[in-house]
Amino acid sequence: MKHVALRKSSVSLAIALALCMVLGIARADEYADVGALLRQGKPDEALAKADAYIAGKPRDPQMRFMRGVILSEQGRGADATVAFTQLTQDFPELPEPYNNLAALYAAQGQFDKARAALETAIKLKPDYATAFENLGDVYGRLAAQSYGRAQQLDAGSKSLPPKLTLVRQLFATAQTGVAAAPPIAPPPRRTVGKNSK
């Protein structure tokens, strides 16, 4: 989420097209349609189509992941949190839902929960660069909180102001849009037919 400088996995046309090849045209068309509706600024239609698909295939992790992304994009953080939490319970081996769950927790200022979710994502996928970057952002936020509290307790400290300034500058740069745009990560993939019913 922009205001906490965490990067979320999201849906893109390239991913939808890749899914077409991997999952077969009929199923992938559903993913592509939902992704296209979301990109066209029609999140309500995208959500309705995702919900209809999930009604027939409730164990499909890709569409459930897309549904969580749609809810996040709609600003429905509580619903998105439920969606991603359910994914982590049903498919604990998938790192992407943990990453998105962490972004939602961080947006709410729940940095300890965000850290735990990101550590799980990294344990599941040790080369998950986005999760590592997000974990760094969470540690930065936790550092800012700790330095701020320490300064409240010891206003005369000479070592705290430069540390606070450094951490604040780090996040001010990210919030002004100077930081690179987040990369697009695919929704979780499963073997065709496995757990899709």
Predicted segments — roles?
Residues 39-40, 73-74, 107, 141, ...:
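Register position in tetratricopeptide repeats
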Residues 27, 61-62, 95-96, 129, ...:
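Helix-start (N-cap) detector for alpha-helical repeat units in TPR-like alpha-solenoids
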